[in-house]
Every structure is written in structure tokens, then in C-alpha cells.
């Protein structure tokens, strides 16, 4: 039972009460979500036979669900994601004995986004007079063909400075604040620029609500990103995750 509750109650774990699917597996759409061995990553634009996913990543695939799981996420074709360190009442696993495919795993797409690593001289930019300027909008719609998801509700920003002089802003983009479609996007105001860049994907755990984001520069060369990750939708059972960057984000 996947009702989102702050205090989950014990439920029956009895299985195999309905017929199995074509592969002889019971309860693929009637019990808890189940871990898959695959690392989560984007689909590639070509046919594959016996795909085994990616060789690495930050989250692994889960599938399935139970009563009160929205049908969109309950479909066997739907791939959710979950951090390997996470655990909660909505996800379990099973052992299936079969020959492992010989297909080679995919490599994660290379991020070619370039950020300056030259340390900014803050003292050279010091001013002693008041500065007045119009606000700079940091939430822009992404390019249509960029592949960056962008929803109608963009909210809860966090912002910090980078050692290279850039400003980094992040926020969540979603249709509903309780939604599982939520992603965290980022934009950068590069040193000397007067316009924030188009948004990029900053953090995504597919089909998990990601309410709660913070950024911090520790003044010793490290940026900290703290973010909540839900068991499903809503924001009642969030765990806190931490990532660091030593290359200006």
C-alpha cells in the first residue's frame, strides 16, 4: 500500500495471490517497488537487445508498485530511480534465477559543459559607492531541443557564489509541489556577464519528489549541495542527500 503517510502502518506481506505474468513473476504490479540491477540513465536512440543499462550512475532503476500508486508510475515500462543508499517501506527486491545477459553496459553521456577554473580576484571588484541595478531574471525557459524538462511551477531557489566569480542558482521545476515529476534545474551568471544562462538539469532522481534545496560555499574551495529526496510524492518522508563540488559546480 503506497499511501504517503508520515507514520506508515504495518501491512500484510502475503504474496502470490494473483496469477503471475508471462515470465512467471508474481506481484510485479501489486506489491512494493522492486530494485533492478541497472543504473539509471537516458534511453539511447537505437534498438537494443537484452540491454543491461549503464556501467555507473548515481541512482539505480526501480519498477512496479501497488495500491494507490498512480498508474503512470505503476506501468511495467516505467523506470523510476532510487539512490542505492536509500531504503523505505515502499521498495523491496526479489531474487530471480536466470542467465545474465552478455550485453555490454552503456557509458553515461559525457557532460561537455565548460566552467572557468580561474580563481576570481574579489578585491579587484570592490566598490565603495552604492550600486543600483534592475533585477536579473534567472529562470528562463530552456531551448526547445535541449532536452531539459521545464514545468509550469518553478520555485524554492537557492543561490551561492563560486570561487571563479560566477553565481550559481538552483530551483525546483514541477507541475505540482507534491508531484513526482519534480526536477532541480540550475542557471549560472558568469563573472562579468549581465544575463543568466538557460537552465540545465542539476539534480534528478526520476519519479521522486525533490523538495528542499540548499547551496553553500565553504570558502575553502568546496561547494555543498543539500537536497531532499522523497520516498515517492509529497514531502513527508524526505531523506537528505549531500553532494560536493571542487570545480565551481
Task: Tell what function each PLM region has.
Residues 1:
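Short, well-ordered surface patches within globular domains
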Residues 106-249:
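Asp-box/BNR beta-propeller blade signature and adjacent active/binding-site loops
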Residues 5-13, 17-18, 22, 28-110:
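Surface-exposed recognition segments
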